[in-house]
Amino acid sequence: LLATDALTRLRLRPVARVGCLALFLAAVVAALATGYFDDLSIMREYRVNAATFGREVQRHLWLAFGSLFAAVAVGLPLGLLCHREPRLRAGVLGALNFVQTVPSIALFGLLMAPLAALAVAVPWLGEHGVSGIGAAPAVVALFVYALLPIVANTVVGLSQVSPATVDAATGMGFTAGQRLRQVKLPLALPTILTGIRIVLVQNIGLVTIAALIGGGGLGAFVFQGIGQT
């Protein structure tokens, strides 16, 4: 993070910035490979818990990316619908904004009872891992949190497309579907990708809290360390 921030402040060109960052990462990897950091306590701790660490990293990434993909699959169509229906937009964005005000640990806790009841009512879901604790409430909470940036950025991106551009496409004989696929979405894509990037950063941080409800991830090490102090 420090290296990335420093490169940004230097105002280098994109190619030079990527090259400098690659050199920095190569130096860190070389130092790790040669054992330069082996005497540090964090490296000793890693060697003792290497298998557990690898498993929790995989679970952390699965929770973060799994909820992201689900949010993209739902958020993009919902954003398109909100763009077309202004009255629906106000209600949907208002509800998603309200969800963002709920603390993550509180939302994780609120989902435990409904999901536990759902697993009892529908045994098939319980057999496939849905329960009041574990990954299920974590994925649902992360999914709900992820919807606002994706839906909002989709609406903003589509709204920023120039009406003159859309009119030109109409004059060329484009249908409504063609205007959406070939004109509006490509022009709105940078804004939509910004929303997805925000969600990914947000999810990676929030997954840490999931360890409190048995969701696993790197948060398990965080709370283990807190418990030992």
Positions of the model-derived regions?
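N-terminal, non-cleaved signal-anchor transmembrane helix
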Residues: 1-62
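Cytoplasmic-entry segments and transmembrane alpha-helices of multi-pass inner-membrane transporters
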Residues: 20, 78-114, 142, 147-159, ...
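Membrane-interfacial helix termini and adjacent extracytoplasmic/periplasmic loops
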Residues: 40, 108-149
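Transmembrane alpha-helix signature in integral membrane proteins
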Residues: 53-81, 196
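Alpha-helical membrane-interface segments at transmembrane helix boundaries
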Residues: 54-62, 96-100, 189, 193, ...
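Intracellular coupling helices
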Residues: 158-170, 178-182
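Transmembrane alpha-helices
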Residues: 176-210
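Interhelical loop and adjacent transmembrane-helix boundary motif
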Residues: 215-229
